[in-house]
UniProtKB/Swiss-Prot annotation:
Phenotype upon gene inactivation: Abolishes the production of ergosterol when erg31 is also deleted. The double disruptant also leads to susceptibility to cycloheximide and to staurosporine, but does not affect tolerance to nystatin and to amphotericin B.
Recorded name of the encoding gene: erg32
TM helices/strands, residue ranges: 67-87, 149-169, 210-230
Protein name per its UniProtKB record: Delta(7)-sterol 5(6)-desaturase erg32
Alphabetic keyword roster: Endoplasmic reticulum, Golgi apparatus, Iron, Lipid biosynthesis, Lipid metabolism, Membrane, Oxidoreductase, Steroid biosynthesis, Steroid metabolism, Sterol biosynthesis, Sterol metabolism, Transmembrane, Transmembrane helix
Pathway annotation: Steroid metabolism; ergosterol biosynthesis
């Protein structure tokens, strides 16, 4: 994240904090220094701001604020662009809307929930990035510093480490003490769309992202690989909610496996793989009609929904959702 912050400082934040310095008049604390900032041009004020103690690039509060803004703005843009790409390019909107469990105005609701909670996730995530750029952890610069074998091994280790911890965090969020206040919001979307990918309570989203940020504090990780992985896992979150069932892979926890989680609640907690679901007896094979349209029929769908409603009542109690289908209102 230090690379991102360096470029952000150079092209955005130096000027941004310079403008803050400019806003102080001669009666402010800035004017009480040896340099009278009100007599300087913008370029000099920018330089004054970044060399003063409060707005220096290395000041911890400036770094925290900058990292929060980067995480919030870039996270929001990444979510909106990737989810919109999936939604408008290949997501089958008509088929999703025909499902009896699709909510009224669902896409709008998903988007609003995500936009409301992304700032909270960002402010909780910023301290991890702050610790990383201030030298804590094991993030390293050169690609070959630990050898290329370890470089690729660290990617596999990152995925396994994250998947293991996310599995247990996600499963814990289904405990009755945590489900209603935190995780139920994300399960409002029984038939997910790409916009549901980040539509959850900020503490829910943050807790499931913790393993990504914890990893470089336990294992060496190249900083460029870290950025690549962080971007990739965010896009993966969109992919497993996009309703595009490319393959029925027994190892990878794809969109079909995650669709089963949203539909049946207590299965397929993994993020990337099915390994820990299989080991811990929470694996459910995706419904085969997701892959073969010829298997789909109204009778089978009604059977699936009856089972889902039984599980849903056990987990949540009375259903308070408002569905788009008139017969379910």
């Amino acid at each position: 994240m230090d690379v991102v912050l360096q470029y952000a400082d150079k092209y955005v934040f130096d000027t941004f904090y310079g403008k803050i310095a400019e806003s102080f008049d001669s009666s402010s604390s800035f004017a009480n220094t040896a340099v009278n900032s009100t007599t300087l041009g913008l370029a000099e004020k920018v330089n004054f701001a970044i060399t003063s103690g409060l707005l220096d690039r290395n000041n911890v509060w400036r770094q925290f604020t900058s990292l929060f803004l980067i995480t919030w703005i870039m996270g929001t843009l990444s979510y909106f662009l990737s989810a919109s790409f999936a939604y408008y390019v290949y997501f089958d909107r008509e088929e999703a809307r025909r499902h009896p469990k699709f909510l009224k105005n669902q896409e709008h609701l998903e988007l609003m929930v995500a936009l409301k909670n992304l700032p909270g996730m960002a402010i909780l995530t910023a301290p991890w990035f702050l610790a990383e750029i201030r030298g804590y952890g094991y993030v390293y610069d050169k690609l070959d510093e630990y050898g290329y074998f370890y470089l690729f091994f660290s990617i596999a280790l990152f995925l396994l480490f994250s998947d293991f911890l996310i599995y247990w965090i996600h499963r814990a969020l289904h405990h009755r003490w945590l489900y209603a206040p935190l995780h139920k919001l994300h399960h409002k979307w029984i038939v997910p769309t790409p916009y549901s990918s980040h539509a959850f309570h900020y503490l829910d989203g943050y807790s499931q992202s913790l393993p990504y940020h914890m990893f470089p504090f336990f294992f060496p990780l190249n900083k460029y690989v870290y950025l690549l992985l962080f971007g990739s896992v965010n896009y993966w979150t969109v992919l497993i909610h996009d309703g595009k069932y490319f393959s029925n892979n027994a190892v990878v926890n794809g969109a079909a496996h995650h669709a089963a989680h949203h539909m049946y609640f207590n299965y397929n907690y993994g993020q990337f793989f099915t390994l820990f679901d299989r080991l811990c007896s929470s694996y459910r094979q995706p419904d085969q009609e997701l892959f073969d349209a010829e298997l789909r029929n109204e009778k089978l769908q009604e059977q699936r929904i009856r089972f889902m409603e039984t599980v849903q009542y056990t987990v949540e109690g009375k259903d308070d959702r408002t569905y788009a289908s008139k017969k379910d209102n």
